C-alpha cells in the first residue's frame, strides 16, 4: 500500500512485464542453464526444456498472476480468501499462506549473500582486481577470501535493493526494472555478438545446437529440464502472485505470462551463447555450474580472451542487474505481508524486513549453500503447489476462469483449466518429490 492507504499498482503494462522478467531472470539462467545445455546434449536438452516452459508458462505463471489480481493481496490473505469461499473460514488458508511468504524471505536472505559476492566482483572488474590473477587457483583463493569478507558488499547490495523498494511499486520497482532489464539484454547480446566473431567460438555453438535423438530417451534429461524450467520461471506462490496483485483490471494476464516465459527463455539462451563459446575459446569444456562457474572458472576464462578486462566489466554489470531485480522480487512478498497484516507504511515495512535480511544474511553467510538448498528443494516448490491448489482446486473453476480471461478478446480454450488443475499441479508435486529424493533438480 502507498502512503494514502491505497494499494500500489503498476504504471504500465511494460513495467509489470519487465518486473516479472526481472524476477525470473536470475542466477539459474546464468550459472546453471548453460552448464546443463552443455552436459545434456545441447538441443537434446532444449527440446524438453522448451516443452516444460510452455506448460508452466501457460498454466502456473498465469495462475499466480490471476490469483494475485483476484485477491489484491499477498499469499496469506489470498489463501485465506480461498478457504473462506470453500469452507467458510480463512484460518487454514492464512496459516498455509505463511509458507510461501517465509520461503520468499528465506530465499531472499540467502540470495543477498550472493548479491554481495557479485558486487565485490563487479567492483574488482572495474578496478582491475581480476586481471592480475594468474590461474584457476588464484581465482579460487580470491573467491574464498570474498566469501569470508563479504559483509560490506552484502550490506551495500541490500541498501540499494531496499532503497528501490521503499520508493514503491510504480516509483521504485517498476522504474528499476525498466532500466535494468533492457540493459541486461543489451549487454549480454553485445557480449554474444563480440564472442561470435572470435576464432574458435564456433566449437561452442556445436555444444548448444547439436541434437542427439537418443538422448531424449534419458530420463535425467527430462528431469533436469523440468527443474530448470520450473525454477527459472519464478513459480513459488509468492513473487509472481504479489506482482499480480498490483495489476489493473484491464490487464491481459495470459498475454503477459507468455511474454515473461519468452523473455526468460531468451535470457537463458543468450547466457548460453556467451558462456559456452567463451569456454570453447579457452579450449575448455563447460563442466562447472553454480558459484564456482561464475566466480572462479568463468572469470579466469574471460580474462584471457582479447578485450578480457572490458568483457569482465560488461559481464558482471549485466549479472548485477539480474541479481538485483530478482532480489527485489523475493523481498516484495514479505514487505507486502507486513503492510497488509499490520497496516504499516511501505518505508517502515521495508526497513523492518531489511533489518531482518541484513542481520540473518550476515549470520548465515558461511552456510549459504545449505540454506539455499533447503529453500529451493523444499520450500519453493511447496509454496508453488499450495498456490496452485488454492487457485485451481479451492477458489472455484468459474471464478478462476473469469479472472484468467478478464480483459481478453479471445478467452483461453477449454484445455486450460484441466491442464492447470491436473497436469500443472501434478508436475509441481513431482518437482517437490524429485527434488527431495535427488537433492535438488533446479
Put a short name on every predicted segment.
Residues 32-49, 68-74, 117, 172-180, ...:
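Transmembrane helix-loop boundary segments of multi-pass membrane transporters
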Residues 15-17, 23, 151-152, 263-269, ...:
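Loop-to-transmembrane helix boundary motifs in multi-pass membrane proteins
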Residues 12-52, 238-239, 244, 254-258, ...:
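Transmembrane helix-boundary motif of multi-pass solute transporters/channels
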Residues 4-7, 36-40, 73-102, 112-170, ...:
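Inter-helical loop and helix-membrane interface segments of multi-pass membrane transporters/permeases
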Residues 1-32, 60-65, 69-95, 248-252, ...:
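Membrane-interface "cap" regions at the ends of multi-pass membrane proteins
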Residues 2-6, 10, 174, 178-324:
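Membrane-embedded translocation segments of transport machinery
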Residues 151, 364-391, 409-442:
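A generic transmembrane alpha-helix motif of multi-pass inner-membrane proteins
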Residues 321-330, 350-360, 376-403:
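Hydrophobic alpha-helical segments of multi-pass membrane transport proteins
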Amino acid at each position: 500500500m502507498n502512503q494514502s492507504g491505497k494499494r500500489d499498482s503498476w504504471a504500465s503494462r511494460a513495467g509489470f512485464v519487465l518486473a516479472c522478467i526481472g524476477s525470473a531472470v536470475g542466477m539459474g539462467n546464468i550459472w546453471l542453464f548453460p552448464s546443463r545445455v552443455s552436459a545434456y546434449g545441447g538441443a537434446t536438452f532444449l527440446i524438453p526444456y522448451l516443452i516444460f516452459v510452455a506448460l508452466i508458462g501457460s498454466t502456473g505463471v498465469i495462475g499466480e498472476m490471476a490469483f494475485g489480481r483476484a485477491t489484491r493481496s499477498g499469499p496469506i490473505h489470498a489463501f485465506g480468501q480461498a478457504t473462506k469461499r470453500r469452507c467458510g473460514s480463512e484460518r487454514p488458508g492464512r496459516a498455509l499462506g505463511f509458507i510461501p511468504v517465509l520461503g520468499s524471505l528465506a530465499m531472499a536472505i540467502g540470495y543477498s549473500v550472493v548479491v554481495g559476492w557479485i558486487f565485490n566482483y563487479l567492483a574488482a572488474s572495474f578496478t582491475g582486481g581480476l586481471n592480475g590473477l594468474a590461474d584457476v587457483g588464484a581465482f579460487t583463493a580470491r573467491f574464498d577470501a570474498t566469501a569470508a569478507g563479504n559483509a560490506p558488499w552484502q550490506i551495500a547490495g541490500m541498501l540499494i535493493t531496499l532503497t528501490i523498494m521503499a520508493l514503491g511499486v510504480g516509483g521504485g520497482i517498476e522504474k528499476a526494472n525498466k532500466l535494468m532489464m533492457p540493459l541486461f539484454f543489451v549487454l549480454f547480446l553485445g557480449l554474444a555478438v563480440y564472442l561470435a566473431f572470435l576464432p574458435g567460438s564456433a566449437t561452442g555453438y556445436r555444444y548448444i545446437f547439436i541434437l542427439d535423438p537418443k538422448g531424449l530417451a534419458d530420463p535425467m534429461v527430462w528431469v533436469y529440464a523440468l527443474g530448470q524450467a520450473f525454477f527459472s520461471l519464478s513459480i513459488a506462490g509468492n513473487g509472481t502472485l504479489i506482482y499480480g496483485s498490483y495489476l489493473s483490471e484491464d490487464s491481459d494476464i495470459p498475454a503477459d505470462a507468455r511474454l515473461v516465459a519468452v523473455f526468460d527463455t531468451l535470457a537463458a539462451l543468450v547466457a548460453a551463447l556467451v558462456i559456452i563459446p567463451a569456454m570453447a575459446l579457452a579450449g575448455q569444456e563447460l563442466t562447472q555450474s553454480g558459484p564456482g562457474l561464475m566466480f572462479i572458472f568463468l572469470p579466469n576464462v574471460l580474462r584471457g580472451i582479447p578485450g578480457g578486462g572490458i568483457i569482465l566489466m560488461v559481464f558482471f554489470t549485466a549479472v548485477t542487474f539480474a541479481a538485483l531485480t530478482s532480489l527485489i522480487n523475493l523481498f516484495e512478498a514479505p514487505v507486502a505481508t507486513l503492510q497488509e497484516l499490520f497496516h504499516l507504511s511501505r518505508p517502515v515495512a521495508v526497513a523492518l524486513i531489511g533489518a531482518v535480511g541484513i542481520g540473518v544474511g550476515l549470520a548465515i553467510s558461511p552456510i549459504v549453500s545449505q540454506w539455499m538448498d533447503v529453500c529451493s528443494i523444499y520450500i519453493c516448490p511447496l509454496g508453488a503447489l499450495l498456490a496452485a491448489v488454492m487457485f485451481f482446486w479451492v477458489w472455484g473453476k468459474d471464478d478462476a476462469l473469469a479472472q484468467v480471461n478478464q480483459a481478453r478478446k479471445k478467452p483461453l480454450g477449454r484445455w486450460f483449466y484441466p491442464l492447470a488443475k491436473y497436469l500443472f499441479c501434478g508436475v509441481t508435486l513431482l518437482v517437490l518429490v524429485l527434488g527431495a529424493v535427488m537433492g535438488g533438480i533446479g
